[in-house]
Each structure stands twice: as structure tokens, then as C-alpha cells.
Amino acid sequence: MEVISTNTNGSTIFKNGAIPMNGYQNGTSKHQNGHQNGTSEHRNGHQNGISEHQNGHKNGTSEHQNGHQNGTSEQQNGTISHDNGNELQLLGSSNSIKPGWFSEFSALWPGEAFSLKVEKLLFQGKSDYQDVMLFESATYGKVLTLDGAIQHTENGGFPYTEMIVHLPLGSIPNPKKVLIIGGGIGFTLFEMLRYPSIEKIDIVEIDDVVVDVSRKFFPYLAANFNDPRVTLVLGDGAAFVKAAQAGYYDAIIVDSSDPIGPAKDLFERPFFEAVAKALRPGGVVCTQAESIWLHMHIIKQIIANCRQVFKGSVNYAWTTVPTYPTGVIGYMLCSTEGPEVDFKNPINPIDKETTQVKSKLAPLKFYNFDIHKAAFILPSFARSMIES
């Protein structure tokens, strides 16, 4: 493994009950413009709820400012309460619901929230780019949040990860060179290593704290960073793509945050143009693309941008993820001009033999040939809007 660092180490705030990572000092950090690009399994950029941990002797509150009614982010900090009564402050979050629960709020899904019971807080800190927290939940194992938004759950996030990898890579023959924008925890890399044809994987993660959390709490994932085919780059994902050699990659996977605030650029035409340039003829890209239940206006704009850039094919797929808003998430799958790519009919499906014998990984939990094909079948309301 080669590790290339293009950003500075983040400083981290630790309060009572948090578990500090080695090498970080107490202090504050400032958000930089690079936050929008190359984050790990991201859905951040929200006004997020945060819980209070366990029996919480001191209930933390958050006072909503008047701007909250207009979707602005003027909110007070939320807290987590611990059994010993100490409070752990999570900066930039909105109010919690009750002791022992993590709750996520966002202007992207107004009028609703998602909550998980917290068994144990494992880590909380602030990097140069975001608040990072990891806790053990009662239902889904370890839960990673960034800026108070759930990014991945150990026992419930596999549909998202398997689909964002196998929908594109299962649609092209023998992928060899792949780029992951984000992926600092390692779930996406874990799935990608199922393909014996792969010779090189570049991972661009902007936040070194996310990588450190992986090494400490997900060692079975972080071990894959040591694979000789893997280069881990700590830096800006959009800048990396822009500077990439033309026609170099067979596939690019974009694990981005939601297309609001600083992450908006990752869903607009200039970024997609850079991605298309970095792909070979007939190369493919897959990026997360929100929920059909809440974000059709966003999805239509993403599709319009992709249709202007990608001259091969442009497709929308979706799947179920229990810990994401509305329980579903979508994907944009596009190909550059060149050899035809039919995303709806995979030609390189991962089968049982490839998964368990050649790659020596555990069987897939969600993805299969039928799920791949079904992901492109949309409800009537979504199909009419997307195809219009």
C-alpha cells in the first residue's frame, strides 16, 4: 500500500467519555473548501440530530433559531449524555430526542427523523472537515456518523456498499483500474477486491480521521489498505479527478455527500466532465443519487447534467438501505462513448465461486444477478419523471 497525504492533520475536540485517537490534540478545527470532495461513505452537510447516550443523567437540549423554519442551519449544539452524567458535545448538530438515542434530522427530509438506540459511544472528534462519531447501536452494530449524519452501519449498510460496487463493475468485462472517491472506512474497497481482474485501486479520502477510525475500530477493513494494488490518497477527490490521466480508469465510484451545501459541486456538470475525461472509452461511473421519495427534483437535475456529459448510457437505479432516509437510496450509472455498456444486463456478475474461492471473501449478503436487474425497475411515478 502507498499512502499519499495532500491535506493537513485534523485537530480534534475530546470531551468526557470520548475515546481519542493517537496523534490528535484538543482544539478546534475549521471547515475548508475541500470538504465537498472525496469524503468517505458520505451523506453529510445536514442539520443533524444527535442523541443522548444511555441513561443520560443530564439531558442535552438544542434551541432552534428562527431560521430553522426556513431550512437554515442556525442551531445550537446537541449533546450526548453518559451514564456518569458527563456530557459529550457534538458541534453543529441539532436537538436530540431522549436519553440513550441518536436522532438524525435534516432539511432534506423535513418533518421526519431517524433514531437508533445507543449502546456505547466508541469515538467522537472533530477533524479539519467534519465531526466524526462512531457508536455501538442496539440494532445495526457500529454506526459511523459524519456531521451528525449516518454514513454507514456495520450490520445494515451492506446493501448500499454492494450495489455501488457491483452495479458498475458487474456491467463491464474485466475491470483493471478503478478509482474510489471517498471510501476511507474501507467497506467499498472490501467489495471491490472480489474482482480478480483488478490490478490497481486508487482511494481518495479527504479526512485522515476517518481512516484512523477505520484502523482502530474496523481493522479487518483497514487491512485491505495494505494490499499492493491499493494506493490511499489523503486529499481532495475532485482535484484528483481533474488532474488524472485522460482515459486511465475503467470505473470510478463516487461515495459523496448529499448534493447540498459544499458537496453540491460533486453533482454538477464540471465534475462529471472531469470524471468522463478520466475514464477510458466505455468506462463507467457510479455515484449515489438520493431518494425517489423525497428528492425527485434533485435527481432530475443530476440526470440532466449526466446526459449532457456521458455519451454512452445514463441510468438510474435504486435499492433499500434501512438506515437511510425513507429506507432507500439511488445511484446514477453512466458510461462514456465507446464499447456499449448495458447496465441492466450484467456481463460480469459476481458468483459464488468467484466470491468465496478466488477472492477468499465471505458470501455476498445482498447483491445477486436478479437484484442487479431489478434495481433498474422503477415505480411508475419515478419512471415517468426520470424518463421525461
Swiss-Prot record:
One of its GO terms (biological process) is alkaloid metabolic process. Induction: Triggered by jasmonic acid (MeJA); this induction is repressed by 2-chloroethylphosphonic acid (ethephon), an ethylene precursor, that can by alleviated by 1-methylcyclopropene (1-MCP), a competitive inhibitor of ethylene receptors. Accumulates upon wounding and feeding by the specialist herbivore Manduca sexta; these induction is dramatically amplified by a pretreatment with 1-MCP. S-adenosyl-L-methionine binds at residues 130, 205, 236-237, 324. Its EC number is 2.1.1.53. It comes from the Eukaryota. Mainly expressed in roots. The active site is at residue 255. Keywords: Alkaloid metabolism, Methyltransferase, Polyamine biosynthesis, S-adenosyl-L-methionine, Transferase. PROSITE patterns: PABS_1, PABS_2, SAM_MT_PUTRESCINE. Belongs to the class I-like SAM-binding methyltransferase superfamily. Spermidine/spermine synthase family. This is Putrescine N-methyltransferase 1. It comes from Nicotiana attenuata (Coyote tobacco). The lineage of its organism: Eukaryota, Viridiplantae, Streptophyta, Embryophyta, Tracheophyta. The gene is PMT1.
